[in-house]
Amino acid sequence: MSLLIDFIDETEEVKEEYMSLIREVLEKAAQMESIEDGAEVSVTFVDNERIREINRDYRDKDQPTDVISFAMEEMGEGEMEIVGAEMPRMLGDLIISIPRAKEQAEEYGHSFDRELGFLALHGFLHLLGYDHMTEEDEKEMFGRQKEILEAFGLGR
């Protein structure tokens, strides 16, 4: 299983070991979700101010959040599907707030590693079409998150 992950660290605080952890968690998720080899995702680490700007500009919520996902496969109104015979599948972009991840790890009483793995996985599942807008969808998404985290060894 080979997922291509492009990391961008705007905070200059993210250690290589954290990127390796995220790579391993997302590889496990891709395997469990039967995502084809060569699919691509980008992961950008930002501070609270930057994620607040993105949240405001794209989601009309003027506050910082922990993770934002931009799925490349979601069709917008009036967009045409572009089919590339030999192009790898681009799943989308994940944007993770490092300060928020640290705050939440402390708040929930678990490690920063676990929180970072959780946030990356949560965003990744959104890229795959999972959501939690309804109670039924939430149950499905959170159940799948739990399965993958436990299979990886990051369960609670």
Curated annotation (Swiss-Prot):
Free-text remark on how the cofactor is bound: Binds 1 zinc ion.
Subcellular location: Cytoplasm
Cofactor: Zn(2+)
EC number, UniProt record: 3.1.-.-
GO CC list: cytoplasm
Annotated keywords: Cytoplasm, Endonuclease, Hydrolase, Metal-binding, Nuclease, Ribosome biogenesis, rRNA processing, Zinc
Transmembrane segments: none
One Gene Ontology biological process: rRNA processing
Similarity comment text for this entry: Belongs to the endoribonuclease YbeY family.
Molecular function in Gene Ontology: metalloendopeptidase activity; RNA endonuclease activity; zinc ion binding
Residues given in the record as Zn(2+) binding sites: H122, H126, H132
Record protein name field: Endoribonuclease YbeY
Function according to Swiss-Prot or TrEMBL: Single strand-specific metallo-endoribonuclease involved in late-stage 70S ribosome quality control and in maturation of the 3' terminus of the 16S rRNA.
